[in-house]
């Protein structure tokens, strides 16, 4: 199949996927889009939102529609790396046998990732980066495709272990999950307080997802789009010669080269899902906020003057 035909097929599958997901999830269009873009782009996602906004349900629903295995890990202060990676046990033959942990799954929901100590966070982040884990000196590859969706609660920050910048950088997207609108909440309450059950169809499988991930990397990009993405990221760096006034006034730390890479991959995927065979600058802009918002560090002045991260990114674009 030619790449053009494959993109057309991806568009059809994407629409079918969204229809299936919306049988269960009411609203949250942007969140669903961004999670699907990160899956097809071979990235990982950090969902930030207060409890009860269907973050877990969303991941569960997506894994059903994609026909992938799914595990949920609830991160707590006493969780150890071996609890998520797995450990060696002595079997009845008196031999050591590796017992796989919950990380060995296609989709892993890391719930409240900031509630666990750095030691356990780093075990998860090694898995995200290397797509394999190390236990008792042996390396074990994780199932492919492998996708981590971590959640974080923006309130109740006491007793948490905030993710350092280097670890946040591993996430392709930082997705804000907002409260539903009045009409959406009406629909949610109506659907969840009755005894109706929804059966979901499997739209694509793991092999097709990996084919689509390869397809997206093959999509060509014009030099002006590439230049726009790299320049946008460079504008976030305070000591860059082209840094605008807003960067010097409100940003302490800018984004690294990984942001430029993700902007291009995200733009390619956004273009493909919308039936375009090559991304333009609008596609870069469409994915800029979730890619940049966790890679920039605001200073005290920005916080004091109420300059949100999204507002700064908008002005930079």
Where are the predicted features?
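AAA+/SF3 P-loop NTPase mechanochemical coupling elements
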Residues: 97-106, 135-152, 163-172
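Conserved AAA+/SF3 P-loop NTPase catalytic/coupling segment centered on the Walker-B
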Residues: 82, 104-129, 143, 158-167, ...
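Pre-Walker A (pre-P-loop) alpha-helix and adjacent loop at the N terminus of AAA/AAA+ ATPase modules
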Residues: 7-53
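Conserved C-terminal "switch" segment of AAA+ ATPases
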Residues: 7-11, 24, 174-246, 273-277, ...
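C-terminal engagement/docking regions of AAA+ P-loop ATPases
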Residues: 1-2, 240-317
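Short glycine-rich substrate-engagement loop in P-loop NTPases that contacts/grips substrate
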Residues: 77-106
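Walker A/P-loop
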Residues: 39-76
């Amino acid at each position: 199949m030619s790449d053009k035909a494959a993109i057309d097929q991806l568009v059809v599958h994407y629409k079918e996927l969204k229809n299936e997901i919306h049988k269960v999830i009411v609203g949250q269009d942007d969140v669903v889009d961004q999670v699907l873009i990160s899956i097809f782009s071979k990235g990982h996602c950090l969902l930030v939102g207060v409890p009860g906004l269907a973050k877990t349900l969303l991941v569960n629903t997506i894994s059903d529609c994609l026909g992938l295995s799914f595990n949920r890990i609830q991160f707590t202060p006493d969780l150890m790396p071996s609890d998520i990676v797995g450990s060696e046990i002595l079997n009845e033959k008196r031999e050591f046998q590796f017992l796989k942990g919950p990380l060995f799954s296609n989709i892993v929901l890391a719930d409240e990732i900031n509630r666990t100590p750095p030691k356990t966070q780093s075990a998860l982040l090694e898995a995200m980066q290397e797509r394999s884990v190390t236990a008792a000196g042996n390396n074990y590859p994780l199932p492919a495709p492998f996708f981590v969706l971590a959640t974080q609660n923006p309130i109740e920050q006491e007793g948490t272990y905030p993710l350092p910048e280097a670890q946040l950088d591993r996430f392709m997207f930082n997705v804000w999950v907002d409260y539903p609108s009045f009409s959406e909440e009406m629909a949610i309450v109506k659907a969840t307080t009755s005894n109706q059950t929804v059966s979901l169809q499997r739209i694509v499988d793991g092999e097709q997802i990996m084919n689509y991930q390869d397809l997206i990397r093959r999509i060509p990009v014009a030099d002006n789009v590439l230049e726009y993405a790299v320049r946008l990221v460079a504008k976030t760096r305070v000591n860059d010669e082209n840094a605008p006034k807003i960067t010097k006034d409100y940003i302490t730390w800018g984004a690294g080269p990984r942001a430029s890479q993700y902007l291009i991959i995200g733009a390619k995927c956004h273009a493909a899902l919308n039936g375009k065979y090559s991304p333009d600058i609008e596609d870069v802009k469409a994915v800029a906020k979730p890619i940049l918002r966790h890679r920039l560090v605001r200073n005290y002045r920005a916080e004091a003057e109420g300059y949100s991260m999204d507002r700064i990114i908008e002005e930079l674009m």
